[in-house]
Amino acid sequence: MYVLMCPCIQDPGLRARGITRESDLRAFEKALRRCRECGLDVVFLPCPETLFLGRDREPGTFLERLNTGDFFHLLDRLERDVKDIIRARGPPLCIVGVNSSPACGVDTTYYGDDGKGPARRAGRGVFLARFPTIPAVDVTDFCRYRIYLAAPLFSAAERRYNAHLRDILTAHFFLVFLPQEAGDDSSHRDEESQQAIFSRCCREIAESDIIVAVIDGADADSGTSWEMGYAYARGIPVVALRTDFRRAGMHEHVNLMLEQSSRVVRNEEELLQALKAPSVLRAGKLEVK
């Protein structure tokens, strides 16, 4: 399996002058690390802006710098080159793009002021728009792949379901920390063991990108609730999975403090969508001509 990736993620010097922040560089590095750690090959796309305007260029919108016949001819050639890659290798898992880019934006692009909308508007950049049936993910979403799976683990059924969830997430190229596989699976623990488990779990939460919490039952597990609160206090997003059809009230799926501090989903498909797993974002069949 492979991804098509914007080349500036590997070489930020391809970007316009002065737009790259430290947070961008961290996201770029983590996106590349995800591919290495999850066994994804990377095929880098060409950079239309650099090929057309050169390096060390001033920032500009599509309408300001790229809206010319010569640029569209360049896009035609690059599109053919990319489709040759797809024909040889098969469809990619996704394209990893960079939001706001005039050419390679995913959710937003600097199109320019045409009197019909804001200069920065929703939609793909002009190059990624040439591949509408390939799912595209912004690098700041793709780089969030380390998951802490918070869930009750006291019964065999709970542990089996936790392992089932871990396997699903791993199959979608996430790295998952499962506390029951790190020693937190027994009631026979001395004080030293308890402290070691607590410290390990706190550290793993702090190093995670997202918490996935299982909150089934008449009342959510107390340990899971604490892990959710700890993550929320640290600014780590929490996605809460509640497959239980019982509700806490007329307007609440579960305790409001848990619901307001997380995104609650009802099944595994919604969980993968909330995590922006590339394989569930497919829009249709890719036609390579």
Where are the regions that the model predicts?
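Extreme N-terminal starter segment of soluble prokaryotic enzymes
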Residues: 1-3, 145-146
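Short catalytic helix/loop segments, enriched in acidic residues and glycine
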Residues: 21-39, 165-170
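Short connector loops at secondary-structure junctions
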Residues: 40-59, 141-142, 177-185
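Divalent-metal-activated hydrolytic enzyme cores
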Residues: 53-86, 116-145
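N-terminal glycine-rich phosphate/adenylate-binding segment common to multiple enzyme folds
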Residues: 81-113
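Short Gly/Thr/Asp-enriched flexible loops that form oxyanion-binding sites at enzyme active sites
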Residues: 100, 104-131, 223-232
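Conserved catalytic or regulatory cores that recognize and/or transform ribose-phosphate-containing ligands
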Residues: 134-289
